Amino acid sequence: MGLPWYRVHTVVLNDPGRLLAVHIMHTALVSGWAGSMALYELAVFDPSDPVLDPMWRQGMFVIPFMTRLGITDSWGGWSISGGTVTNPGIWSYEGVAGTHIVFSGLCFLAAIWHWVYWDLEIFSDERTGKPSLDLPKIFGIHLFLAGVACFGFGAFHVTGLYGPGIWVSDPYGLTGKVQAVNPAWGAEGFDPFVPGGIASHHIAAGTLGILAGLFHLSVRPPQRLYKGLRMGNIETVLSSSIAAVFFAAFVVAGTMWYGSATTPIELFGPTRYQWDQGYFQQEIYRRVSNGLAENLSLSEAWSKIPEKLAFYDYIGNNPAKGGLFRAGSMDNGDGIAVGWLGHPVFRDKEGRELFVRRMPTFFETFPVVLVDEEGIVRADVPFRRAESKYSVEQVGVTVEFYGGELNGVSYSDPATVKKYARRSQLGEIFELDRATLKSDGVFRSSPRGWFTFGHATFALLFFFGHIWHGARTLFRDVFAGIDPDLDAQVEFGTFQKVGDPTTRKQAV
């Protein structure tokens, strides 16, 4: 036939049986990829340290999605929370991966069957004997079934009525676990960070889908609307389906990048805005202040800070610190986190506490500046030593650690003080193992960044696809060169412009 690559799908345009076959094969490919990818990730995933080496640091992409839907255990005997399990059953990571691969195989066979037996009675119009599909009716069926699935997910799976619930955590990503969620029917259900909104919205949207599906099954579209929206043309279905997909892709790109109850930071890593706003830093200082108010020493107060919370407050976990073409997991960048060294407190020789100004997200290098509690610059690491006034040596800066591995250790030699001041620009200080994975020291993005980039990019491409196919179906007659007045009788000489009734000649 010699079709160009971008027109090869025309072979299934008027062939409902084989159109169905290629869609089943596509489902087989998607499901097969999901199952295979899950098995690959499970083969390389190290569950031994859920605090300092969680799934998102290791670049896991499908494991977080399984986990947020309630899968936490492995046939390998480990649990995502760090415990051990004995009999996880079919609803384990490997079990779900296996069911996807089995389903993929069944879809593969079904696709072959439908490709061979393409000329089914159900696809032919009984009046004309030609292949045809009742698209409005099919739309109603699909809407109804999607509504049932949506309602079932919200009413049973999420609520724990018949299912595990979903991953729920606190605002700082410390206490996450799979649990049942009650629907939130008040205004709080519209807060994207309230898990109850997931249940209530699925129940509401599912109910609407069921009712809309029944409506479209029982009511035929008006003739003008049917013709105006080209409801008899399969390319209309393609165009509107692409619209639904690109809209969903834009939405999930937003919920992933800005954060929401559907994208917990324990599974996908923190968002860049949590670094920009000092979100975890504020919580750490609040906890330390509370500890001091309870008459704890500074060392005791800092020692009570969970290592998990301190680790979030580190720029290497900011998904916007990755770069274009920097492939690999976060662990391949700055290394595998081994332990928290503790919180460094800097003081000048007058005893003032100094704070290192943190590096903004989009900087690769940043001057080392130490300010007091009023924001006045008191010390720095100068670019030109000859002109320096605030150098660590001149100001006599010392550093003492509270909490972590270096708890109670202090340094006064300028080289060591400057080393820890530089590292403080990047948030809390961690010991990182760069040898094991031959990590190159260049920051990588988390799966949060990859997911957002991928979905935003494809959403844009699919938006153009929607415009393209929508225009093709709406203006099909124009593109085909069919003029509604093509067979009109034209009297030569009557009009100045042939066939244009607005230019009638006046009789002299």
Curated annotation (Swiss-Prot):
UniProt xrefs under Pfam families: PSII
Topology of this chain in the membrane: Multi-pass membrane protein
Co-factor binding comment: Binds multiple chlorophylls. PSII binds additional chlorophylls, carotenoids and specific lipids.
One example GO MF annotation: chlorophyll binding
Gene Ontology CC: chloroplast thylakoid membrane; photosystem II
Chief place of localization: plastid
Protein's cellular compartments: Plastid, Chloroplast thylakoid membrane
InterPro entries per UniProt: PS_antenna-like, PS_II_antenna-like_sf, PSII_PsbB
GO biological process: photosynthetic electron transport in photosystem II
Highest taxon of source: Eukaryota
Keywords of this entry: Chlorophyll, Chloroplast, Chromophore, Membrane, Photosynthesis, Photosystem II, Plastid, Thylakoid, Transmembrane, Transmembrane helix
TM region(s), chain numbering: 21-36, 101-115, 140-156, 203-218, 237-252, 457-472
Function: One of the components of the core complex of photosystem II (PSII). It binds chlorophyll and helps catalyze the primary light-induced photochemical processes of PSII. PSII is a light-driven water:plastoquinone oxidoreductase, using light energy to abstract electrons from H(2)O, generating O(2) and a proton gradient subsequently used for ATP formation.
PANTHER family, sorted: PHOTOSYSTEM II CP43 REACTION CENTER PROTEIN
Complex formation: PSII is composed of 1 copy each of membrane proteins PsbA, PsbB, PsbC, PsbD, PsbE, PsbF, PsbH, PsbI, PsbJ, PsbK, PsbL, PsbM, PsbT, PsbX, PsbY, PsbZ, Psb30/Ycf12, at least 3 peripheral proteins of the oxygen-evolving complex and a large number of cofactors. It forms dimeric complexes.
Family: Belongs to the PsbB/PsbC family. PsbB subfamily.
Protein name, as recorded: Photosystem II CP47 reaction center protein
Organism: Secale cereale (Rye)
Lineage of source species: Eukaryota, Viridiplantae, Streptophyta, Embryophyta, Tracheophyta
